[in-house]
Amino acid sequence: ILLKSGNRKAWWFGKVIWNILSVLGFYLVLYLSVTAVSIVTGGFKAAQPEVVAFLLENQKIENAGTELYMYAMAVPVIVSLAIAVTQMMIAVVFQPPMGYIWVCAVIAAGIFIYSPYSLGNYLMLMRTPVLLYGSILNALWAVVLGSLLILVSVVIGSITIEKKDIYS
């Protein structure tokens, strides 16, 4: 495909677009599946108040509603896009296994490191301000961080692809 495009940057941007569309496609299938199951079972219930109250030991759920759906549905998509594009860039700059190691490290860091800079935290609904009183996570920061990571990864990949011998 690189030979047909004749331009390394066009090939790189094509890979980026394909990567982004793939991630969006996976989420679309997920959301459509959840919707179909919800229709069959009699309604969409993202969080049953009684169950959530029990799990959170009767803590008050802050900002339920729109913010819950934002943290549950929109923020993970942005973070997943950032992780996927960065993995692809690392695979081009270094080697493909390094990209997989980076993804595992990001997700594992989200388990052990509670920080607004740790992308893995934004993939866990329990760490968000909706379900965790006093949470340091912020949806806007997640979008900014994810978008910045995508932009930096695209630029670094574009620069690298021009200089690197990718045929060998």
Label the predicted regions.
Residues 51-67, 98-168:
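Terminal transmembrane helical anchor/hairpin motif
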Residues 8, 19, 107-110:
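Short, solvent-exposed loop/turn segments at secondary-structure junctions
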